[in-house]
């Protein structure tokens, strides 16, 4: 089994095992490793030893392939110690009921009942095989889930940058990493810019560690055991599985897979057992409760039978067979398989559920808090408008750059509009930029805003000048400062200039002058001019554009370090409005969710005008902006209780930060809401963890956000949340349906034998027949109900309450009615057949046995949906169900028509008229349930009409 090592937590929350785990970690980390060797080598020595280039990485793909053959893939593989054969044999030993059946077969053999002994042995083999296959499917399904979120990284190889799976890395590869990334291997850092890494999942220390490219002097640690540099002191090493909290950097891979510090620890801890999901625990408890009731009933049946003078061996065999059939030991397994297969089905629809319990929660979500950018919108930014104070003077005179509305000269380009302030605005967008061009894909890679700014240069015939200047320092964008700044050294005059881009309000706040359209002159900004800039920015925002401000600061002293305090007295150059259109399917998805009683809240860093415009486009109701929109500033002034009181009317949070998300989730959960929260950044992680369903983005999401989330949208599309909630509700309905099928069959089988014993009638079913019914009840027909296609109308129902039970009052009524129907029909056939000669013959038990099996198949057909008729959902929409029922009926025909099986099940041939009679009677369970569904639908329609009128 190959687990994604980056999804594993090294510190178990169970306090009883914490010391053992910490000791194992310390032992693993004290061993020699590549990180220990390379931390004491200089950058040049490391590059020489690994024969790689500090700018281009490995020089050829062949070299990378050779190293992969030598070192293996960058994966941590946990070998399964137990063979399939051993696992299969363990099923005979671990189940007490199976051991009792084996004992029964042995007793039968010694008493000369060879036929019974052979029959029971064959039945045991079939029952164990079915159970083993179920467990194997469950394990394989869960293994598949571990591979759904592969780790990725930014690789530079052969001078080309690409985004690849971390498993493809080899020693010598050059890797770039930035804030939010998870380190994909053990890496010798060769460049670090304000780099801090969270190593808590490796060392247990909560404080992020500052990293540099400086070599560690080994002689400084001669006082340590064996002169080993402690793992926490290797400041030039970035460890696999740790998280970049601040800044960015690059480095050379020195260790991969198990040859890493993380791998060493992971290997020692792969035997830690994973906890069961709440639903599995519920099923375990339900199974135990039903087992207790079943044991009491079976014990009474056995005792009464023996008192009545029946054969003790016969009663023992029937009792054990009943125990095997009636006790739903397969419930947790089928639930796990259903959940896992549902998760795999969701993955095909672009929603990767990382934790099985989340599937249960999805059906209860009644509030979705969604980011705007990249989730509700397409995340493909294009520069739509550009405005400069001196060149354009008022909000009406804006340079339109939309593809369909471009203002161009006769030559078809925008070069003639390059006034000094326009040129400088575009230059700032060029230099305040970390996007890069991929030769392999011939596109820009990076932040969508950065990409849009670089793409716009060509329209003005301006080159990308980043390789002609030297970036001295960078102040990365974050949600608090809401701007990005770079300190650039111009090689021509050796002067440094700070270039700044960010939210227009923040840029305007720090600006005291503006750039003229000619001659690189600046003038002081007046309050009237600031009002004009604000007016223009708000005008762009009201059109749904994201508005950025641009400014610069010329440093008199080039040695002045770039800090946040330095960002003041800026020279304003211009505004750029970017368009990020809504995703095509978002409006329909929101409409469906609103119909299903889900409150949609949009959270954005944009201005109120931009947010309201987008909300109206995608169908989020904004009746009164004063009530429906809440800004981040107002949110800061409110307590959680105050927010909880007003949030029912709020659909938009504007100028919000990731920190605000935490307040929003707290307020919603305080009200008792079940919250799904989307996020993609490092600072989103707390809110994602606190929410009931944290949803991260697969494309633009940081590794930190993915780690904190319960679900990953691989297409970053909001409408995928709709399909996930739909699947979650559908899976829960399917679990209820197969529970109804299993428990009604179990109750019917128990009651049938109990009634026969109570009224001193011969047993209508023998041990082999009961075991066959168990195979049908726990086997393919039951599992096929778990994969019933989702009914899209589940979204018209309100979210399920968190406290709702699986076995609701309605479900209990349904399964008891079904069981009663099966009992009455089967007893009727048994008594009718026995009354003809007053004896129990092979024909009597064959008719009773076949009647029960037919009832079972019609019951399974009825259980495909709780309220819809089979004629509405269609007979052929669940292929697995049709195959399962077909095989079950074929098996039943073998049991009554093939001599070998006749001797095992004690059956005889039935005529066509017998089969038709049994089909007619057993179909009654299907007809009764269809009538129940019809009554339920009419009642729901009447209730809906009544409430609509009210």
Swiss-Prot record:
Its main location: Golgi. It is found in: Golgi apparatus membrane. The modification Phosphoserine is found at residue 227. Gene3D superfamilies: Calcium-transporting ATPase, cytoplasmic domain N, Calcium-transporting ATPase, cytoplasmic transduction domain A, Calcium-transporting ATPase, transmembrane domain, HAD superfamily/HAD-like. The keyword Translocase applies. It is a multi-pass membrane protein. The active site is at residue 371. NCBIfam families: ATPase-IIA2_Ca (TIGR01522), ATPase_P-type (TIGR01494). Belongs to the cation transport ATPase (P-type) (TC 3.A.3) family. Present with 6900 molecules/cell in log phase SD medium. This is Calcium-transporting ATPase 1. It comes from Saccharomyces cerevisiae (strain ATCC 204508 / S288c) (Baker's yeast).
């Amino acid at each position: 089994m190959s687990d994604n090592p980056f999804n594993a937590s090294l510190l178990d929350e169970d306090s009883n095992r914490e010391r053992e785990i910490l000791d194992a970690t310390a032992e693993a980390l004290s061993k020699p490793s590549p990180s220990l060797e390379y931390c004491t080598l200089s950058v040049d020595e490391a590059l020489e030893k690994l024969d790689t280039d500090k700018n281009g990485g490995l020089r050829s793909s062949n070299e990378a392939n050779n190293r992969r053959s030598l070192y293996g893939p960058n994966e941590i593989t946990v070998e399964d110690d137990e063979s399939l054969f051993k696992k299969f044999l363990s099923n005979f030993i671990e189940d007490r009921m199976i051991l009792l059946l084996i004992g029964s077969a042995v007793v039968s053999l010694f008493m000369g009942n060879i036929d019974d002994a052979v029959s029971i042995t064959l039945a045991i083999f079939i029952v164990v095989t079915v159970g083993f296959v179920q467990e194997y499917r469950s394990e394989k399904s869960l293994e598949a889930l571990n591979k759904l979120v592969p780790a990725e990284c930014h690789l530079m190889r052969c001078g080309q940058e690409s985004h690849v799976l971390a498993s493809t890395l080899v020693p010598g590869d050059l890797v770039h990493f930035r804030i939010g990334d998870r380190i994909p291997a053990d890496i010798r850092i060769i460049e670090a810019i304000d780099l801090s890494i969270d190593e808590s999942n490796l060392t247990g220390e909560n404080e992020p560690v500052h990293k540099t490219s400086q070599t560690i002097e080994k002689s400084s640690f001669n006082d340590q055991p064996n002169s080993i540099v402690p793992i926490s002191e290797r400041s030039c090493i970035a460890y696999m599985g740790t998280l970049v909290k601040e800044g960015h950097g690059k480095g050379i891979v020195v260790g991969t897979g198990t040859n890493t510090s993380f791998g060493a620890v992971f290997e020692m801890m792969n035997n830690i057992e994973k906890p069961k999901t709440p639903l599995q625990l519920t099923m375990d408890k339900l199974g135990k409760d039903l087992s207790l009731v079943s044991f009491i009933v079976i014990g009474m049946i056995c005792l009464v039978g023996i008192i009545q003078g029946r054969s003790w061996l016969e009663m023992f065999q029937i009792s054990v067979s009943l125990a095997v059939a009636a006790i739903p030991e397969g419930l947790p397994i089928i639930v796990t398989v259903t959940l896992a297969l549902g998760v795999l089905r969701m993955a095909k629809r672009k929603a990767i559920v990382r934790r099985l319990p989340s599937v249960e929660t999805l059906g209860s979500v009644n509030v979705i808090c969604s980011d705007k950018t990249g989730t509700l919108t397409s995340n493909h930014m294009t520069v739509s408008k550009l405005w400069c104070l001196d060149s354009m003077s008022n909000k009406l005179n804006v340079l339109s750059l939309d593809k369909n509305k471009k203002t161009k000269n006769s030559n078809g380009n925008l070069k003639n509009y390059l006034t000094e302030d326009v040129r400088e605005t575009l230059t700032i967008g060029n230099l305040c930029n970390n996007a890069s061009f991929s030769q392999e894909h011939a596109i820009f890679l990076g932040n969508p805003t950065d990409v849009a700014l670089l793409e716009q240069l060509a329209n003005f015939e301006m080159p990308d000048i980043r390789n002609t200047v030297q970036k001295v320092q960078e102040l990365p964008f974050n949600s608090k400062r809401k701007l990005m700044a770079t300190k650039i050294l111009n090689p021509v005059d050796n002067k440094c200039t700070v270039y700044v881009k960010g939210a227009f309000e923040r840029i305007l706040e720090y600006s005291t002058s503006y750039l003229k359209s000619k001659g690189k002159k600046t003038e002081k900004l007046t309050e009237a001019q600031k009002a004009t800039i604000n007016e223009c920015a708000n005008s762009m925002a009201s059109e749904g554009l994201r508005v950025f401000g641009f400014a610069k600061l010329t440093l008199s002293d080039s040695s002045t370090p770039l800090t946040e305090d330095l960002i003041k007295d800026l020279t304003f150059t211009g505004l750029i409005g970017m368009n990020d259109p809504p995703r095509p399917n978002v409006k329909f998805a929101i409409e469906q969710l609103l119909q299903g009683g889900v409150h949609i809240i949009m959270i954005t860093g944009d201005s109120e005008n931009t947010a309201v415009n987008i909300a109206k486009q995608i169908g989020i109701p904004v009746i009164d902006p004063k009530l429906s929109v809440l800004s981040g500033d107002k949110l800061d002034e409110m307590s959680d209780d105050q927010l909880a009181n007003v949030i029912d009317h709020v659909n938009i949070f504007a100028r919000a930060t990731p920190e605000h998300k935490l307040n929003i989730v707290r307020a919603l959960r305080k009200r008792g809401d079940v919250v799904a929260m989307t996020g993609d950044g490092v600072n989103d992680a707390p809110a994602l963890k606190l929410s009931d369903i944290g949803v991260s983005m697969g494309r633009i999401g940081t590794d930190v956000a993915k780690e904190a989330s319960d679900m990953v949208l691989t297409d970053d599309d909001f409408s995928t949340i709709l399909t996930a909630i739909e699947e979650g509700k559908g899976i829960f309905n399917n679990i209820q349906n197969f529970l109804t099928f299993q428990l009604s069959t179990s109750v019917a089988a128990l009651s049938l034998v109990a009634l026969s014993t109570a009224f001193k009638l011969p047993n209508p079913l023998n041990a082999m027949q009961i075991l066959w019914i168990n195979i049908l009840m726990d086997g393919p027909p039951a599992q096929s109900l778990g994969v019933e296609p989702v009914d899209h109308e589940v979204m018209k129902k309100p979210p399920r309450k968190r406290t709702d039970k699986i076995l609701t009052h309605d479900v209990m009524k349904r399964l008891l009615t079904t069981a009663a129907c099966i009992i009455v029909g089967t007893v009727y056939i048994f008594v009718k057949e026995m009354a003809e000669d007053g004896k129990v013959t092979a024909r009597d038990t064959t008719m009773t046995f076949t009647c029960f099996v037919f009832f079972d198949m019609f019951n399974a057909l009825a259980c495909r949906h709780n309220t819809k008729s089979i004629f509405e959902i269609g007979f052929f929409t669940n292929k697995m169900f049709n195959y399962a029922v077909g095989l079950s009926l074929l098996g039943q025909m073998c049991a009554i028509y093939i001599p070998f099986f006749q001797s095992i099940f004690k059956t005889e041939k039935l005529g066509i008229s017998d089969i038709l009679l049994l089909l007619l009677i057993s179909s009654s369970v299907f007809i009764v349930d269809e009538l129940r569904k019809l009554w339920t639908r009419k009642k729901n329609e009447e209730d809906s009409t009544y409430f609509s009128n009210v």
